[in-house]
């Protein structure tokens, strides 16, 4: 590795680590305030909100990485400008495009490490966080999971326990469903079997219900069953993809497919992870171009503010297309790729004559 390459890599990584640490601390403090507000009426040990905030912070930091790279790039070039090192490189024959290339390769590999290791660690901590916090919410009385055997739901309503298994899930309906209802002592009350159950509301409508009580069987054309679940709640329970590692997402996708459950959100999460290293590179190039074009600005704060303002615009563009993807207005690939294409076009237009800067 050349001396200038080592210098560029070291300087950029130092800027990156400084910004990462600042973001981590800021997000931790914000999380802590949220947890303190949540537990203000609950008797818990002092360290517990501190601990919850700590294990919840990495996933929020992961979502902020594109902007961490953007600000890191701005600080990196500020350092080069301050000590006139960018001109020294230029006089030595090192073009700006070469600097961009070296750091783009670095960022790509850092991005792979972030997605492969940091994300998996963050998702495991997020899962731990959700599990610990669920003990202090009303949601702890029910549970829903998706396995190879379909959708399983455990619910407690009016002290009765419902164990529900459906082979598939489609259009506000559970299909091929078997329900076992127990009392609080786990004594069986009845079993219910149905091909279709309307779960639009929390009061389910069981169509052509086969009811088994002891050795007796009864068929009812329409049976109402009150639960804590409706279609929207079930969807929301499975919408927190950030608590799943990459391999867990792939496994969950297979289960979703067998259950005929929408793959949109899980595909969005997977494709987002795959494209994240490229997104980091584009954000680096974008920030680098801004810094090169504002090199003559004496006020460093103005450069940072310009970058932050433009990063907010990029965030809302990304969020807009992501919402279009989740609502299935456009397909999954388009919702992730279009913002990257827009950023690529902007970079391509602005990077002209960058070696003359």
Predicted regions and their residues:
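General N-terminal targeting signals
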Residues: 183, 196, 216, 221-223, ...
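Mature-chain termini and adjacent capping regions
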Residues: 210, 221-224, 245-247
């Amino acid at each position: 590795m050349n001396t200038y390459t080592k210098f560029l890599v070291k300087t950029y990584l130092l800027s990156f680590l400084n910004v990462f640490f600042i973001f981590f601390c800021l997000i931790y403090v914000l999380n802590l305030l949220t947890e303190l507000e949540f537990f203000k009426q609950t008797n818990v040990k002092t360290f517990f909100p501190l601990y919850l905030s700590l294990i919840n912070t990495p996933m929020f930091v992961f979502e902020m990485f594109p902007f961490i790279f953007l600000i890191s790039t701005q600080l990196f070039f500020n350092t080069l400008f301050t000590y006139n090192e960018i001109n020294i490189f230029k006089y030595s024959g090192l073009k700006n495009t070469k600097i961009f290339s070296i750091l783009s390769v670095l960022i790509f590999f850092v991005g792979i490490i972030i997605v492969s290791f940091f994300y998996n660690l963050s998702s495991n901590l997020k899962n731990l966080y959700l599990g610990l916090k669920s003990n202090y919410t009303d949601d702890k009385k029910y549970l829903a999971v998706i396995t190879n055997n379909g959708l399983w739901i455990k619910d407690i309503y009016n002290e009765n326990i419902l164990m529900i298994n459906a082979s598939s899930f489609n259009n506000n309906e559970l299909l091929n469903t078997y329900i076992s209802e127990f009392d609080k002592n786990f004594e069986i009350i009845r079993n219910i079997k149905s091909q279709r159950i309307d779960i639009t509301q929390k009061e389910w409508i069981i169509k052509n219900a086969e009811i088994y009580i002891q050795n007796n069987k009864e068929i009812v054309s329409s049976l109402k069953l009150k639960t804590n679940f409706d279609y929207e709640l079930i969807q929301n329970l499975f919408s927190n993809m950030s608590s799943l590692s990459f391999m867990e997402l792939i496994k969950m996708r297979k289960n979703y497919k067998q259950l005929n459950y929408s793959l949109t959100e899980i595909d969005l999460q997977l494709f987002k992870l795959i494209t994240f290293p490229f997104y980091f590179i584009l954000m680096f190039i974008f920030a680098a171009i801004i810094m090169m074009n504002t090199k003559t600005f004496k006020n460093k704060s103005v450069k940072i503010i310009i970058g932050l303002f433009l990063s907010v615009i990029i965030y809302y563009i990304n969020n807009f297309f992501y919402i279009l993807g989740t609502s299935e207005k456009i397909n999954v690939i388009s919702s992730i790729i279009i913002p990257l294409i827009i950023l690529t076009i902007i970079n391509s237009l602005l990077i002209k004559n960058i070696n003359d800067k």
